[in-house]
């Protein structure tokens, strides 16, 4: 599994705070900066599920597995890719809030692109189905 997280750092923002927001939900292995017309874009990558443990933990801690599953499932692109976004300001305080509409996150979202050989297993691991608030199947970590 390969994960890429992309987030804008606008000219009015503190790059350290944006990096903190990213690192509250993601453990990047590599981070590179690219210039953009609104500031810079941080592009962070990693291989394997370990880098998404913070995001998974926040989803479980907040008890939003079903909502997360619904949003993430709508982001399936093709047979091996999932794309979803979360609110950068919420991530700064350690909360996961999914962005489903353009412009919903005024300072721009954190956008995740996950490439995996088994999309269903990835979704079942990150945000499993629940029944009456209890997880009834916890998938093993994806490739």
Swiss-Prot record:
Gene3D superfamilies: 3.30.1440.10. SUPFAM superfamilies: RL5-like (SSF55282). It comes from the Archaea. InterPro entries: PAB1135-like, Ribosomal_uL5_dom_sf. Signal peptide: none annotated. Disulfide bonds: none annotated. Belongs to the UPF0201 family. PANTHER family: UPF0201 PROTEIN TK1335. This is UPF0201 protein Pcal_0593. It comes from Pyrobaculum calidifontis (strain DSM 21063 / JCM 11548 / VA1).
């Amino acid at each position: 599994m390969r994960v890429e997280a992309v987030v804008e750092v606008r000219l009015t923002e503190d790059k350290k705070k944006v990096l903190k927001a990213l690192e509250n939900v993601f453990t990047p292995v590599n981070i590179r900066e690219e210039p953009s017309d609104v500031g810079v874009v941080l592009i962070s990558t990693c291989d394997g599920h370990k880098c998404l443990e913070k995001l998974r933990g926040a989803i479980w801690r907040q008890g939003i597995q079903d909502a997360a599953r619904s949003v993430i499932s709508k982001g399936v692109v093709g047979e091996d890719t999932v794309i979803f976004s979360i609110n950068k300001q919420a991530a700064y305080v350690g909360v996961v809030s999914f962005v489903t509409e353009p412009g919903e996150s005024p300072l721009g979202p954190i956008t995740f692109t996950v490439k995996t050989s088994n999309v269903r297993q990835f979704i079942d691991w990150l945000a499993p189905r629940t029944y009456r608030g209890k997880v009834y199947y916890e998938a093993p970590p994806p490739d």
